[in-house]
UniProtKB/Swiss-Prot annotation:
Pfam families according to UniProt: COX2, COX2_TM
Protein location: Mitochondrion inner membrane
Origin organism lineage: Eukaryota, Metazoa, Ecdysozoa, Arthropoda, Hexapoda
Transmembrane region(s): 27-48, 63-82
Catalytic reaction(s) noted: 4 Fe(II)-[cytochrome c] + O2 + 8 H(+)(in) = 4 Fe(III)-[cytochrome c] + 2 H2O + 4 H(+)(out)
Designated name of the protein: Cytochrome c oxidase subunit 2
Binding site for Cu cation A2: C196, E198, C200, H204
UniProt entry tagged with the keyword Disulfide bond: no
CC cofactor: Cu cation
Protein's gene: COII
Length: 227
């Protein structure tokens, strides 16, 4: 989520987020070129004093303004389709977690381990430390190992929710009575923040998500303390 003095996209913490950042830059370059061409054409038409009153058609210019948009769309569509395929790729996961949206907190279950279940509530503002973010800190962080394929299953117990962590390119709807899944891998240690991205009631803004990425050794130690 956006934090103080943070502009543009967040730093990617997964391979897919890095690919999406590259695609964003690629698309912005295409849009810049289109803006320059259209701006030059408009300026030329408005400022030139020369006109051709006898011109009835122009096959060349009609071919150009038909072909150029088609070529531009191809250059945007091909990497976009590749990313859509990668986002839906469900490779073998080493760890599976289940997150359940409730009004207004999250419940987590580590289904690969015994008795690893907990709830996460937003930390009140009067209990925050000086290095913690308002409306983004929780009492129990979700700890996961880095460089490990993780599958997250989402559901809800009451109304629609959405489990979203932008730095990991994750936004999975949590629907009552259904299980949705997403795959991701964290490639560096750190804290990654998210929030519920589906309006779910009065306290919708107070459902933060905090994922703590650690090494395998520290993750096993955390598991032993939770079990």
């Amino acid at each position: 989520m956006a934090t103080w003095s943070n502009l543009s996209l967040q730093d990617g913490a997964s391979p897919l987020m890095e690919q999406l950042s590259f695609f964003h830059d690629h698309t912005m370059i295409d849009l810049l070129l289109i803006t320059m061409i259209v701006g030059y054409s408009l300026s030329y038409m408005l400022l030139t004093k020369y006109t051709n009153r006898n011109m009835l058609h122009g096959h060349l210019i009609e071919t150009i303004w038909t072909a150029l948009p088609a070529i531009t769309l191809i250059f945007i569509a091909l990497p976009s389709l590749r990313l859509l395929y990668l986002l839906d790729d469900s490779s073998d996961a080493m760890i599976t977690i289940k997150t359940i949206g409730r009004q207004w907190y999250w419940s987590y279950e580590y289904s690969d381990f015994i008795n690893v279940e907990f709830d996460t509530y937003m930390t009140p503002e009067n209990e925050l430390n000086t290095d913690e973010f308002r409306l983004l800190e929780v009492d129990n962080r979700t700890t996961l190992p880095m460089n490990t394929e993780v599958r997250v299953l989402t559901s809800a117990s009451d109304v629609l929710h959405s489990w979203a962590v932008p730095a990991l390119v994750l936004k999975i709807d949590a629907t009552p009575g259904r299980l949705n899944q997403g795959m991701f891998m964290i490639n560096r240690p750190g804290l990654f923040f998210g929030q519920c991205s589906e309006i779910c009631g009065a306290n919708h803004s107070f459902m933060p998500i905090v994922i703590e990425s650690t090494s395998i050794k520290l993750f096993i130690k955390w598991l032993s303390n939770m079990m």
